[in-house]
UniProtKB/Swiss-Prot annotation:
UniProt cross-references to PANTHER family, sorted A to Z: ANK_REP_REGION DOMAIN-CONTAINING PROTEIN-RELATED, PALMITOYLTRANSFERASE HIP14
A Pfam entry, by short name: DHHC
Name this protein carries in UniProt: Probable palmitoyltransferase AKR2
Miscellaneous comment: Present with 815 molecules/cell in log phase SD medium.
Catalytic residues, chain numbering: 476 (s-palmitoyl cysteine intermediate)
Cytoplasmic face of the membrane: 1-306, 349-360, 414-489, 568-749
Organism: Saccharomyces cerevisiae (strain ATCC 204508 / S288c)
Length: 749
């Protein structure tokens, strides 16, 4: 903990005294008359009293009182407190931009050290993550090379704030431009910013520092390296990042403890062992031989494994009873999945993510294709011969949908979802940050810390693609790709085709089962089923278990895909994407059950054009970094169970489906504008969900090329970044505010 922590956090928050009280006192204490001014300046007790008023006003951001006091000459803004924090310090701590700017323009010294740690206003602003204040101070001559009594500089304090955006700012505007501020700056204990970030468990900061070239091998006075600190902090992603960067497992600290000893003592042994396993090491830190030298071979093996599983299930269904075949199939599936996780996944690269899961591999696309191939095999060998004479058209439709399924699947796997190209040059990144700061929009909603570029509206960073995806909807493991602006319509065509294809297969299966019933008409024991009450299904399970098992598997997928299509069509009708629906659900849930009002910052809603206008600067501690989080540990046991259950539902997509059904039948009105008043500030709600359903359908199904024939606009997706939104053509790669509807002017985002 730094020396700044000596001051209690309550002392740096907004005081409980109302601004009106301070203003009233100031109006009596500070007068424009020369007599009163002389009286105040001549009386030491009165001067101290006015200084107290000045400090309280600086804390509260009461610019009027601050101006009155300063212009009266009652205080010296560079000597307004002795051995304590000045008005400028308090304004910087509490993120009072207008007050800080006024004091700096009046000649306040930004490099004055104050407080028990001898920190400057820049140090305090960085400590509390106040980006706009830091930018203001640097523009008014604050020296970023200064250190406090503990040897901490702006780089340490920005990391200590846990504000990744401030770390980005300092790296690109201070470290890059000043040779005296090093990314591996050391405090009096020889701790670098990377050691601090690892100890705090800030994986975003650690990743950024490593990307910027921070030294992993550096140790502090206690002999702790970055991996030691990460094991104390207990964040697995940080541990994984440092292992990937070559951290030494066996290096010992001053207490002769290596990483294994430290993990044992800190209770992070399991996290450390999992991280080692994720990156191809055994529990002792020895590099394990990889089963595949090339990651492409590992991916191909994962893709083929479902085919082997399907062949196995088919073969055992021919020789074993249905119950035993199901049990063995489940057992082999579990063994296969665990084998892939243990031996094959470690062979894959960790691009854009700290560990690889099976859903981010070709496994599910292989499962889809193997199911499709098995389905075609059963149709060719069994269903077609029995049904071609009676159901010719159904078989023709099945053949056509089979062809379309293959074509659409291959196109989707290779399609571009709408990834934005990144300009990672230093000049481009600095210009983007500077532009966002001037607009008052340098926040996580408008800036992507993974790609270091401005985020267009409705875009989202994809760890799978490693890029921002325009109008991002979701990642689909079945097509091994993201779904976004350029392939969303193609994905819906694919899903509808697959759904109808499965329907035809199930229909032909039932016809096949009925037609083969005559074989067992005289053998009653074969028609006895303990679970199946339907005679057709019962006889089908006894006569042809392999076809019956495939029928059940297809039926399950038919139900699941049908529910997904209901959600997709509902979202298309409302003009929103899956992440946007989740945002609205989360917003509604928090307001209803946890009594949280969504944070509203005037910096995002003001029509002013820049941060120079003091009225649009966020006033309040860390106003630029406030986020809403829910701690499960802090909830009542009943609410904790509900939160865990809700998380599981979200992962399975059940929440999404339930909300859709409730909206359709009118039980809830999340998307109809009938919500508490505090939600109406949401631009997402005010624009997207209030568009007419016909407009939303047109936006999705027709591309923006109005010169093309209607059928072509419907069936073809645009290869460019342009599409319709609210009936207006927009460029989704540069969409930074929603287009205004006719007769309406919307606030910029």
């Amino acid at each position: 903990m730094t020396s700044m922590s000596i001051i209690d956090d309550e002392n740096v928050k907004k005081t409980s005294n109302g601004a009106a009280v301070v203003t009233d006192v100031a109006q009596h204490a500070v007068s424009d008359s020369d007599n009163n001014k002389a009286q105040l300046l001549g009386d030491g007790s009165n001067t101290e009293y006015v200084v107290d008023i000045f400090i309280e006003a600086a804390k509260d951001g009461d610019l009027k009182v601050v101006k009155d006091v300063v212009e009266s000459g009652a205080v010296d803004i560079n000597n307004d407190r002795i051995d304590e924090l000045s008005g400028l310090h308090w304004a910087c701590i509490n993120n009072r931009f207008s007050v800080a700017k006024f004091l700096l323009l009046r000649g306040a010294n930004p490099n004055q050290a104050a407080g028990p740690g001898g920190a400057t206003a820049l140090h305090w602003a960085a400590r509390y993550g106040n980006i706009y204040i830091v930018d203001l101070l640097l523009k008014h001559g604050a020296d970023p090379t200064l250190k406090d009594e503990q040897g901490l500089n702006i780089m340490h304090f920005s990391v200590y704030s846990s504000n990744i955006l401030l770390v980005v700012y300092v790296l690109y505007f201070v470290v890059n431009n000043n040779d005296n501020v090093d990314i591996d700056s050391k405090d009096n204990n020889n701790r670098t910013p990377l050691l601090w970030a690892a100890y705090q468990g800030d994986f975003l900061t650690v990743e950024l520092l490593l990307k910027f070239g921070s030294t992993v091998a550096w140790t502090d006075n206690r002999g702790f390296n970055a991996l030691h600190c990460a094991l104390v902090g207990g964040d697995q992603r940080v541990i994984c990042d440092l292992i990937l960067s070559g951290a030494n497992f066996y290096e010992r600290n001053n207490q002769k403890q290596d990483c294994f000893d430290l993990a044992e003592g800190m209770g992070t042994k399991s996290l450390f062992e999992q991280a080692l396993q994720h990156h191809g090491y055994d529990r002792l830190g020895n590099q394990k031989d990889k089963l595949f030298k090339k990651s492409s071979h590992a991916q191909f093996t994962i893709f083929l494994s479902p085919f082997l599983l399907m062949v196995y299930i088919y073969l055992i269904s021919l020789v074993l009873s249905p119950v035993l075949a199901i049990m063995l199939s489940l057992l082999v599936t579990v063994v296969m999945v665990n084998t892939l996780k243990k031996f094959v996944l470690p062979c894959l690269p960790r691009k854009n993510t700290y560990k690889v899961s099976l859903t981010r591999t070709p496994f599910f696309s292989g499962l889809f294709l193997s199911t499709f191939c098995f389905l075609i095999y059963i149709w060719t060998k069994k269903l077609y011969p029995y049904s071609v004479s009676d159901y010719t058209m159904k078989n023709v439709q099945f053949l056509v949908t089979s062809f379309l399924t293959v074509v659409l699947f291959l196109r989707l796997v290779r399609s571009d979802p709408g990834c934005l190209k990144t300009d990672d040059s230093l000049t481009s990144i600095q210009e983007t940050i500077k532009q966002l700061i001037d607009l008052g929009k340098f926040d996580r909603e408008n800036f992507c810390v993974e790609t270091l570029e401005r985020k267009p509206l409705r875009s989202k960073y994809s760890f799978f693609s490693g890029a921002l995806v325009a109008r991002y909807d979701h990642y689909c493991p079945w097509i091994y790709n993201d779904v976004g602006l350029k392939n969303h319509k193609l994905f819906v065509f694919f899903a509808v085709t697959v759904q109808y294809h499965m329907f035809l297969f199930m229909w032909l299966c039932l016809a096949y089962f009925k037609k083969t019933n005559y074989i067992y008409e005289q053998v009653e024991e074969y028609a006895r089923c303990a679970l199946l009450k339907n005679e057709t299904l019962c006889k089908g399970s006894n006569y042809d278990p392999s076809t019956f098992f495939l029928f059940i598997w297809i039926s399950v997928n038919f139900i699941w895909l049908g529910a997904m299509l209901i959600v997709q069509f509902f979202q298309i009708l409302k003009g929103i994407t899956t992440p946007e629906l989740f945002i609205l659900i989360k917003e509604e849930h928090k307001a209803k059950f946890i009594n949280l009002i969504p944070f509203e910052n005037s910096i995002y809603t003001s029509e002013s054009k820049g941060v120079e206008d003091s009225d649009m600067i966020p006033e309040g501690p860390s106003a630029t970094t406030i986020t809403h989080t829910i701690s499960i540990d802090g909830l009542e046991p009943r609410n904790r169970r509900r939160a865990i259950l809700s998380a599981c539902f979200s992962m399975m997509g059940i929440n999404q489906w339930l909300v859709t059904i409730k909206e359709i039948v009118g039980i809830t009105h999340i998307l109809h504008g009938q919500v508490p008043q505090q939600h109406h500030s949401s631009l997402l709600r005010s624009f997207l969900v209030t568009n007419h359903w016909k407009t939303n359908l047109t936006d999705f199904w027709l591309n923006s090329d109005v010169t093309a024939p209607l059928w072509q606009r419907f069936f073809y997706s645009s290869d460019t970044s342009k599409a319709m939104l609210g009936g207006t053509e927009v460029d989704y790669y540069e969409l930074y505010e929603y287009p205004a509807r006719e007769g309406e002017v919307l606030r910029p985002n």
